[in-house]
Amino acid sequence: MTSQTTAIGIDIGGTGIKGGLVDLSSGELISERVKLPTPAGGKPADIVETTKAIVARLAAEDPTAPVGVCFPAIVKHGFTMSAANVSKKWIGLNAEELFETGLGRSIHFVNDADAAGYAESQFGAAKDKAGLIILTTLGTGIGSALIYNGVLIPNAELGHLEIDGADAESRASYAAKEREELTWERWAKRLQRYYSHVEFLFTPDLFIVGGGVSKNYQEFMPLLDLKTPMVPAVHRNNAGILGAAALARPGAA
């Protein structure tokens, strides 16, 4: 395959860095998924080196494939404005330039939730859907992505909306359910407050729910009463890889 139909996607997390070569016409991995542990401390130079090793393995299959990298931070013009589960040394860093120097090639650099949302719009639950799509990932926090008519609107940090005097993710994330040992029913009441508020603010056309808990969507989605349709994400473990790769394609949203 040529680089016009493939791209490399890299998903950097607090515990692991994973990547794959993606067929951009189907959204399927056409290589093995390569995963290495995130270096202890999550320092910039160490993460770049680990990423370089993964890209080198994948580029052996298609040396000219463009590269997309998604990262657990607010990303603005290539700078990381926050840092989740990695070193605070990332904050304020021109991370895109750092990766490009370390990898010796141009990349597309994006927030991890934005990459997951874009993956769903291109290859998953929102494929060919018009209007405003909101992806939320329920995990240690609440990640979010906005897609409007297939175009990514970056840095929608909807997990930090204030609900009942607290960050929404401190009360409605899956981590909050586990920490407080909430039943599905009690957790659903918190999700109801959260999604009703988001619905009021944005009037979206579709909610997509991602994160590991989305595989248990039948336990909580039927308990929610919303005007907006809600569906589970199609891509969970590979969403970041697929979205980062798709955004690396020339002319992508």
Where are these regions (language model features)?
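Basic- and aromatic-lined ligand-binding clefts that recognize polyanionic substrates
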Residues: I142
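ATP-binding/phosphotransfer module of carbohydrate and carboxylate kinases, centering on a glycine-rich
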Residues: M1-P66, V75-F79, E97-R105, A119-I134, ...
